[in-house]
């Protein structure tokens, strides 16, 4: 059951450009807050994952595309940060993977299928560039995100185990 390929969306999704950086920063702050609520021991309440120069660098590199979802009024309502990975290990099959580094829909625009459209776009993009698979990380305590990705037919690939040593 491949849900993403069943529909063709006319998606208002484009590559991010430097003038999008203020909105990307705002969305990244929303992601950080979600992660902080799930794991306050690991994530700060506020801060920046990337500075503006790092965002410009990511935008300019072939293997780290950033896409934005822009509505009819030109307002950016979501983003998709990707990393194109190819294993360097001799023990691994040489497959290309599209890793979703970050996906966010603005908190004021949720429940409008924007996240689904971004995921569908990611899958189509991955297929177009010859990827074997699409992967992402999700925190186990982020139940809403887990359900969202399961609904889109993503399956667990591996589990990172943890034992907290400092209380």
Predicted regions and their residues:
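Conserved acetyl-CoA-binding loop-helix of GNAT-fold acetyltransferases
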Residues: 102-105, 111-124, 151
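Conserved active-site alpha-helix within GNAT-family acetyltransferase domains
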Residues: 116, 120, 128, 140-158
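Conserved beta-strand in the GNAT
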Residues: 68, 75-84, 104
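Conserved beta-strand-loop-alpha-helix junction that forms the acyl-donor binding cleft
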Residues: 135-145, 162-166
């Amino acid at each position: 059951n491949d849900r993403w390929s069943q529909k063709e969306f006319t998606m208002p999704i484009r590559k991010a450009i430097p003038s999008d950086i203020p909105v990307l920063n705002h969305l990244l702050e929303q992601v950080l807050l979600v992660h902080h609520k799930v794991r306050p021991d690991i994530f700060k309440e506020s801060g920046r994952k990337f500075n503006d120069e790092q965002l410009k660098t990511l935008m300019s590199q072939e293997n780290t595309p950033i896409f934005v979802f822009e509505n009819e009024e030109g307002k950016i309502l979501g983003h998709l940060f990707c990393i194109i990975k190819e294993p360097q290990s001799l023990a691994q099959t040489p497959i290309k993977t599209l890793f979703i580094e970050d996906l966010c829909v603005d908190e004021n625009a949720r429940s409008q299928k924007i996240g689904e459209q971004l995921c569908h776009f990611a899958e189509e993009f991955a297929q177009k560039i010859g990827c074997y698979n699409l992967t992402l990380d999700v925190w186990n305590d982020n139940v809403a995100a887990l359900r969202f990705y399961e609904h889109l037919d993503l399956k667990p690939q591996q589990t990172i185990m943890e034992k907290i040593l400092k209380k």
